Amino acid sequence: MTDDIFVKKQGFFDAWAPFYDCPLTAIFYLAVHQRMLEYAKLPENAQVLDIGCGTGRLLRRLAAENPTLQGIGLDLSPQMLAEARSNNRYSNRLMFREGNGESLPFDNSQFDAVFNTISFLHDPNPEKMLAEVARVLQPGGYFYLADTTVREEHGDFHWNFSPSGVRFYSPRRREGLGREAGLAVVQHYYLLGPVLLTVFNKNA
C-alpha cells in the first residue's frame, strides 16, 4: 500500500517540477531557509542529507556558504531531481538521488546533519522516516525539520492536498515521534507564520 502511495506522490511532484521554482515559491523557500540556517550547527567538512530536496535549493545554499560541505539530496520525483541536477553548480560536492525517507539508501551514522523542509507532511509513515533519520545520523548529529504545524489542542491535522493527503503535527506530537526514534528535541523555532523548525539531536 505504501509503495502505491509513493508512486502516486511521485507522479504528483513530477507534474509540478517544471513550475516549482516560480517566483512565489522561490521567495517562500528563500525566507524559510534563511531563518532555518540561523539555527543550524555544521562542523567543518560536514556531510549533510536533504530529504525531499526538490529542485535542490537548500543544498545549493549550504554549499555556497560552506566551502568544505558535502551534500546529498534525496527526492521521490525524477523530474524534481532533473531540475536539481541542471542547476547544480557544485557537482564536485553535491549529488542527487531518487528515493524516499522511509528507506534511506545510506550507511549507518553517515551524516552530521539531516534536513527536511516542507516535506515531512507528505510522508505516510512518519515513524519509519524518523527511525531512518536516526539511523543515518552520527551520534550527536542534528535533524532540522521545518514544516507547517498546528496548535496542540487541534492534534494532528489531515488535508487531502496530494495523494494520501498531508498531515501537520503539533510541537508535542513531533517531540513524541522523535523520542520513539531516539531523537531528542533541542528546541522549536517559528520561522514564518505556521512554519515551525524543530531541531532534534541524536543522543551520543
Model-derived features: positions:
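Class I SAM-dependent methyltransferase SAM/SAH-binding core
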Residues: 49-51, 55-103
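Short glycine-centered segments of the SAM/dcSAM-binding site in methyltransferase folds
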Residues: 47, 141-142
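C-terminal lobe and adjacent flexible extensions of AdoMet/dcAdoMet transferase-like proteins
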Residues: 199-204
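A short acidic, Gly/Pro-enriched loop at the edge of an enzyme's catalytic core
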Residues: 102-113
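A short SAM/SAH-binding and catalytic strip from SAM-dependent methyltransferases
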Residues: 113-125
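A short glycine-rich, Lys/Arg-flanked "PGG" loop and its adjoining helix->strand segment in the class I
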Residues: 127-139
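Conserved class I S-adenosyl-L-methionine
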Residues: 1-41, 57-61, 80-83, 87, ...
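C-terminal alpha-helical "lid/dimerization" subdomain adjacent to the S-adenosyl-L-methionine
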Residues: 4, 144-198
